[in-house]
Structures are given as C-alpha cells and as structure tokens.
C-alpha cells in the first residue's frame, strides 16, 4: 500500500498491524 502511505501514513501503520 505505497499509495496509502502518501495519503494516510497512519493508515499504513494500522494495516501493518493487521498483517502482523
């Protein structure tokens, strides 16, 4: 989710938590 990083960096962190 590279595009998400640029739009919502916080959202990307949450996604990483879900994967982990």
UniProtKB/Swiss-Prot annotation:
In the UniProt record, which residues carry a glycan? 4
Q: In which tissues is it expressed?
A: Highly expressed in the placenta between day 60 and day 100 of gestation.
**Disulfide partners:** none
Output the Gene Ontology cellular-component terms: extracellular region
Q: What is its EC number?
A: 3.4.23.-
Its GO biological process annotations read: proteolysis
Where is this protein localized, as stated in its record? Secreted, Extracellular space
List the GO molecular function terms. aspartic-type endopeptidase activity
Key words, A-Z? Aspartyl protease, Glycoprotein, Hydrolase, Protease, Secreted
- What's this protein's family per the entry? Belongs to the peptidase A1 family.
Note on file? On the 2D-gel the determined pI of this protein is: 4.6, its MW determined on 1D-gel is: 55 kDa.
Q: What is this protein called?
A: Pregnancy-associated glycoprotein 55h
């Amino acid at each position: 989710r590279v595009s998400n990083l640029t739009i919502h960096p916080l959202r990307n962190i949450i996604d990483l938590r879900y994967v982990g």
